[in-house]
Amino acid sequence: MAAAVTLAAANVSVTVFESAKQLGGRARGVQNNDVQLDNGQHILLGCYHHTLQLIEQVGGNIEHDFLRLPLQLTLHNRFELKAPHLPAPFHLLAGLLRSKGLSFGKRLRAARFMLALSRINFTLPHDISVFELLRMYDQDDELIRLLWGPICISALNTPIHIASAQVFLHVLRDSLNGLRSDSDMLLPRIDFTALFPERATEYVKQHKGAVLTACSVEAIIPHGEGIKLFTRPTAVSTAHTELFSHVICASSPISAARLFRTVPQLAFIAEQIAGISHQPIYTVYLQYPEQVRLPQPMLGFDRCFAQWLFDKGQIAGQRGLIAAVISAQGSHQNLKHDLLAQKVTQEICEQLGIMEAPLWHKVIAEKRATFSCETNLPRPSHATPLANVLLAGDYTAGDYPATLEGAVISGMLCAKTIAVTLQ
């Protein structure tokens, strides 16, 4: 949808094909027990300038649509970092030096690490794992467990022993070393479908475009100077072939590989995409009685199944609703959903003293939520051997891991490439 909006703004007529009945992909709203949920907790950072600009472009209001929190990282009863109101990067350095839960020597070590990264311009001569990088700069087990590990898992959704240090440094550079507001955390007050895809759909339609849901593209067929798309028949339409001047494939990696594999010029890219591994994200929703609330809107746990808790009452007015997030691979994947919800409930009881039982629970397991952002990962370019077929997605070549900002940048890049050729 980022590509579609960008093209629509350039007065290019676009048609969006969405195989699902609902727009949004992995950032979408879902209904459960008459309560509106997200399929995952998607945090935006202040440095996500392209995403925030795009939301405003289609009619969003950032201050109304998000709860904005200054940089903070709290692991309950174990570690707390809150950045003071200072210009960057002094807000982070002061926050590290004043953080609670670490000795002063370790706090100083963390601050020196950030200064060292700034001196090398957040650039490594060659990629290594995040764990290797942290060890290289004398960050010990406690610093890794309480500070850098949670940041890495949250940002890259990849365990630190295999996560790309260079991509990790890109995230630190843009979020912690720019403007102070770049490190702000923005928690959506409304579900993601309402936040962007629905508004983007109206924007595209107002600019003489079309958005077709429940309409799956089954084949990409080069035809002369154009590209034919073959769509699957549905309950309300027959199979259909339509010719376009350009095509942006913004589907999941699995679907993109399937579509590209049948086109000889794109077969190599299909194999490259198919070689990308994925990581899961589990969200455990627990609906407690309305009076139940967390000490703060976002709270972390140390050495628990639940890594982060979000109080949807404080964030979105959904009182008593707690979302527990478990990022990346782990033993939780071996548990049945009911048992996982039971264990998270027990952790909340033990850690926070919340004795009330949840009225209901819902576990949403996105088993292929993101690409695994590993060291030296060969990510495909947005350009392909067919000049009028482009590839968009957060897994394509770029500075960022699997984030909304990475996806938006990729889509906008494809759109601008096409807009230039049509001038």
Where are the regions that the model predicts?
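Mobile amphipathic helical/loop "lid" adjacent to a hydrophobic cofactor/ligand pocket
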Residues: 48-52, 56-57, 61-165, 169
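Mid-domain catalytic core of redox enzymes
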Residues: 215-338, 347-352, 379-382
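Glycine-rich FAD pyrophosphate-binding loop
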Residues: 8-32
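Helical element adjacent to the flavin cofactor pocket in flavoenzyme catalytic cores
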Residues: 170-233, 246
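A short, Lys/Arg-enriched amphipathic alpha-helix followed by its capping loop at the start of a domain
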Residues: 3-12, 207
